[in-house]
């Protein structure tokens, strides 16, 4: 077993609201290993996105702490529900934005951007603007942008929630293949049981607010995963177990 990449200890998040205190996360404890894919599930309001934002450094915890195994903060890529692309920038320009921010030289930036465009299957759309892309293509651009600086940790906040069912399922396969190629540590918030089981190595289920870990389930399914695995008896058993924990 790998050493934990992330350790969360007694982490709580509270907000003052209308003269009262709203506790979103309550003394959360968990460990996550490097190079694994985690799905984070639970009822709406259970603190899934809040935890993601804390790990990304976007908001602080109220109490408790989280640490990274290497002793230093990893580089992080994040993808939200909406692609949040800059509408005036082409596919190429949107993807290479993190390299521009980090002042990567032009030759290296062009090479990395070209490789990433090929990896996410957008060859031929390099000069397209976001308005000319389908929802699935826009999310591929967002994922490519998050991956281009080779982050240690990829955080995904329901990245496929706004897509139609068929596109969403195709994106599962594409993301699974991307993970297989890169083996990054991924934490994904989702409400979909099938999505969790198809993509993740482990599924963490949070309780109703205030969020605590209710279930930590290993997804014992072989990789690489193909669409057909969703119709196997083992997949069905895991789905039933997971549904019971969420309900």
Q: For each predicted feature, which ranges?
A:
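Conserved ABC ATPase "signature" region
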Residues: 100, 107-125, 176-177
């Amino acid at each position: 077993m790998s050493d934990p990449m992330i350790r969360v200890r007694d982490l709580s998040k509270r907000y003052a609201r209308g003269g009262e205190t709203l506790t979103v996360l309550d003394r959360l404890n968990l460990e996550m290993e490097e190079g694994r894919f985690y799905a984070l599930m639970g009822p709406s309001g259970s603190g899934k996105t809040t935890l993601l934002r804390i790990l990304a450094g976007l908001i602080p915890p109220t109490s408790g702490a989280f640490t990274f195994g290497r002793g230093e903060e990893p580089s992080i890529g994040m993808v939200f529900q909406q692609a949040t692309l800059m509408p005036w920038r082409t596919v190429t320009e949107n993807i290479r934005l993190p390299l521009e921010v980090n002042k990567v030289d032009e030759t290296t930036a062009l090479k990395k951007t070209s490789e990433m465009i090929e990896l996410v299957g957008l060859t031929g759309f390099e000069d397209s603007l976001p308005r000319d892309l389908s929802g699935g293509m826009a999310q591929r651009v967002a994922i490519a942008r998050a991956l281009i600086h080779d982050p240690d940790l990829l955080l995904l906040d329901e990245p496929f929630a706004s897509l139609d069912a068929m596109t969403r399922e195709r994106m599962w396969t594409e993301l699974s293949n991307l993970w297989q190629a890169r083996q990054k540590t991924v934490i994904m918030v989702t409400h979909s049981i099938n999505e969790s089981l198809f993509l993740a190595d482990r599924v963490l289920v949070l309780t109703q607010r205030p969020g605590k870990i209710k279930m930590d389930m290993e997804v014992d399914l072989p990789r690489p995963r193909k669409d057909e695995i969703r119709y196997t008896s083992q997949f069905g058993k895991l789905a039933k177990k997971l549904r019971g924990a969420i309900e």
